[in-house]
Regions:
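Helix-biased "structured C-terminal domain" signature
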Residues: 1-381
Length: 381
């Protein structure tokens, strides 16, 4: 297991060496280190793709400079793949597509609420059911990351995000990361939808975290005088998931308060991911170089509300200690474990669309799980 907490077959340095020749094809014009924009010191990088069809700036973080760079470039790479798809598609209603094989139930997927998914003619593409290995039709809108307009026929039914999009040096890495992400986004959305009392009941004492990865990150925040609040947002799926809030301890409206979230079979890794993402979110906000920030987020009144809400959350007392949960020992075992937990929570159907391109040779997938909430609308997707 790497310092970043995930099962990796190669080092970040090897990953960078592998993808560097691909940068021109991906449209990446530069990679920037943004760590020094903030006081925390957790490495954060950005990869820039000016002609992207989704977002033009991709962030990455890690325990080292190389890990942060690799994270940013791999995020750019997976988005490029999801933008440039050339699959076989069918335009059909949910009732029509099942004549051609198994299909996901559109009613159980994240909807815009603007169109009836039961009667709308949707674009469908084939994926694989990870539980059965059989082909399954998935709405193409939940696979594509081409956000350009006008949208194709059959779009507008689902919330189009990058949720479940993942890549890795091996296919198992990509699939596992995609599964973790959809579980994480579901957990965070459910926490935000809960009552204030229910949210507060999930508070975790940062001092009780005993894992090496999370302790190192917590020390960086503490040394910089940045307050951290943690919530255990694990759902009935029982895969450890955490939400972290980083905000200025004195409450002065300086750097925006930012959330980070993480999920993993190992609770320490899940918490470390949440903390690292909170650090990344701070740097991203400081840099201003993220093209999916909503315009209203820069409004002074909105910023004041965010600071007030963050301070209120920070002052609520933790109610539980960190609970260590260990991984299964390998990526393959962790994936089997995750699929069993999903099935036990009523989400047995886990679709995996393979977006890999032979000329790149890097596994890229999109995971779609009916029954899970999509990305919380208050966060970048």
């Amino acid at each position: 297991m790497s310092a970043a907490g995930a099962h990796r077959g190669v080092t970040p340095e090897q990953t960078l060496a592998r993808v560097r020749p691909l940068l021109p094809r991906l449209g990446i014009t530069r990679i920037a280190m943004l760590t020094g924009l903030d006081v925390v010191g957790i490495p954060v990088a950005a990869a820039y793709r000016p002609n992207s069809r989704s977002i033009a700036v991709h962030q990455g973080k890690g325990a080292t400079l190389a890990a942060a760079k690799a994270s940013a470039v791999m995020e750019a790479l997976e988005c490029w793949h999801a933008e440039m798809l050339e699959p076989v598609l069918r335009l059909a209603t949910a009732g029509e597509i099942v004549r051609h094989g198994d299909a996901l139930d559109p009613v159980r997927l994240p909807l815009t609420g603007q169109v009836d998914p039961g009667t709308a003619r949707l674009l469908w593409t084939e994926a694989a059911d990870l539980g059965t290995g059989r082909p399954v039709w998935v709405p193409f809108e939940l696979v594509s990351a081409d956000f350009t307009v006008p949208a194709p026929a059959g779009f507008g039914v689902f919330r189009q995000t990058t949720n479940g999009l993942a890549c890795g040096n091996a296919r198992i890495e990509a699939v596992l990361q995609g599964v973790y992400e959809v579980v994480e986004r579901n957990a965070v959305a459910r926490w935000h939808a809960a009552t204030p009392d229910a949210q507060a009941a999930r508070g975790v004492d940062p001092a009780s975290a005993d894992g090496a990865a999370s302790r190192w990150l917590l020390a960086r925040f503490a040394g910089a005088g940045v307050a951290i609040r943690i919530w255990d947002v694990t759902t009935d799926i029982e895969l450890p998931a955490f939400l972290a809030l980083a905000c200025d301890a004195d409450g002065v409206a300086g750097v925006e308060p930012e959330f980070g979230a993480g999920c993993h079979a190992d609770a320490d890794v899940a918490l470390a991911r949440a903390l690292a993402e909170a650090a990344q979110a701070r740097v991203t906000r400081i840099s201003g170089a993220r093209d999916d920030f909503p315009q209203h987020s820069f409004d002074p009144a909105m910023r004041a509300d965010r600071h007030a809400a963050a301070q209120s959350l920070r002052r609520s007392a933790p109610t539980r200690p960190f609970r260590a949960v260990r991984s299964q020992g390998s990526a393959e075992a962790d994936l089997d474990h995750a699929l069993r937990l999903l099935a036990g929570a009523g989400c047995a159907q886990v679709a995996c669309a393979d977006l890999s391109r032979p000329e790149f040779g890097i596994p890229v997938v999109r995971i779609v799980v009916p029954g899970l909430e999509g990305a919380w609308e208050g966060a970048a997707a």
